[in-house]
Amino acid sequence: MKVFYIIPVFVLLGVLFHVAGAQVYIPDSEYAGYFDHDGMYAVYGSVKNTDNQTVLAKVQVTVNNGDSTFSESRILPVIYPSKDMPFKFIFPQITSGDPVLQKPLVSFFSTNSNPLNIEVNYDKTLMKYPDGHLTGFITNTGNYTVSNIDVYALVHSKNNQYLDEVENTWTIPKIDPGNKAEFVMYPDQTIAKQVAYYSCFIPGTDSSIEMSTQWKDKTFYFSVLSIVYFTNQNFDENSNSISFDASNPWQMPYYANFMFPSESSNGAFQVLVDGNQINPLISKDNDTQNWHVAFNIGYGQHKVMIAGFDPSYVPNTDEYFYLDEKSALVSWAGFSTFTISDSKLLDVLGIHGSYVPPWVKNTVSYMIYNNVPADDIVNEIKYLKQSGIVK
C-alpha cells in the first residue's frame, strides 16, 4: 500500500514526539488479524485521535507465529481531531500456523493541516451490495482541484464486529471544485459475505513531488510530500547526507515526508534542522519497501540535512522507484500525468519481460475504468505471461 498524506509541531526547532497515550490509540476491539484470500496473514485496525490537535502517527505491528516474530511499521496519513484512521498490514511471510498479535505501538507528533475539502456523500448513492462490495461518491467542496484521491474505510459484521480495512479499487485522478467522483470498495473475499456495513470513511490524497540530486555521478531520485518548499538539494559523499534549503511561508509548522529507495539506507536516518538534531518518524512502506522519513518544518527559512545513507549504494537512476502494483498499472495504462514502459510495469509486477501487446493495454485500461480490483488485473497479466503473450 502506498502511503497517502494530507499535512504536521515544531517546538524549539525539535519535534514534539510522543508514544501514544489515551488521546491517540488503537482500541482492542478494532485490532485483529486473519488469513486473506491469498493465504497471507492480514492485520487491520484503526487509530483514534481523541486529542484536539491534528497528529501524524506511526503504527508498529508485531506478530508471533511459532518461534518466529515479524514486525512492520507505517506512517499513516494525518489524523484530524476526533477522527479515526484505518490501516492494514499484510505479512506474506505468514501463510500458516497460529499467529498471535502483540499489542500495537503508536508514536505520533502534533501538527497542523489544511482540510482536504473532500466529502463522502452519505445519501442513497452510498450502496452496499449482496456480495459485500460498496459504491459511493465523493464531492470536492473546496475551491481548488484535488488530485490522486483514495478513500479508506472499515467494514463490520451484523454484530458490529470489525472485519477488515478496505480502500477504493483505484485512485481517483482528480476532482475539480464542485464536482463529484464515484469510488468502489471490495472487501477481502474471505470475509465479504459477513460484511453488514462500512464506517470511518476517510479520503486522502498523495501530492508528492519528485526530486533528484547527483550521487556518484548518477542521478539519485527520491520524493517528498509537503507544502514546504525544498530547493538546492545536494548530496555530500563525505557525510553520506543530503542537504536542502527549506522555506515555509505559512506562519505555522508543517510536516515533510521524504521517500527514499529501500536499498539506499538501513533506516538509521538522522535529521538536522539548522544544525539541531530532531527525532523523525521513520518507517518502511509495506508494499514498495521504500523508506519514509517524516518531520516538521517551522515558519521561515531553514537549513535541513538528512544523513544515514549507505555509502556502498549505487543509485540505479530509477525515476519511478516508488511505484507499487496499482500505481504502476495506472501510469502504464494512461491514467496518470506520466507513463511508464512495458518493461518497467513488468518489473514492478515481478514479471520477467519487456513487451506487452497494445491490445492488452487497452483491455487493462477498460478494466481500471470499470473498477476491476488490481489483484485480478495482475493475475490476468501473469496468465498472459505464462501463455507466451506477454514476452
Report residues per predicted region:
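Surface-exposed beta-strand/loop patches in extracellular or lumenal glycoproteins
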Residues: S247-G267
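Short proline/glycine- and polar residue-rich coil/turn motifs
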Residues: P77-D84, I172-K180, S283-T288, N296-G298
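Acidic, Ser/Pro/Thr-rich low-complexity regulatory regions
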Residues: Y313-K391
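C-terminal beta-strand-rich structural cap/linker in extracellular carbohydrate-active enzymes
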Residues: P92-D98, I191-Q194, D285-Y313
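Short acidic/proline- and small/hydrophobic-mixed sequence motifs that coincide with surface turns
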Residues: N52-A57, T145-N148, Y162-D164
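Asparagine-centered strand-capping/turn motif at beta-strand->loop junctions
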Residues: V47-D51, I138-N143, A246-N248
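Terminal connector regions
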Residues: L76, F91-H133, E165, T171, ...
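Secretory targeting signatures
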Residues: M1-P27, V59-V61, G136, V271, ...
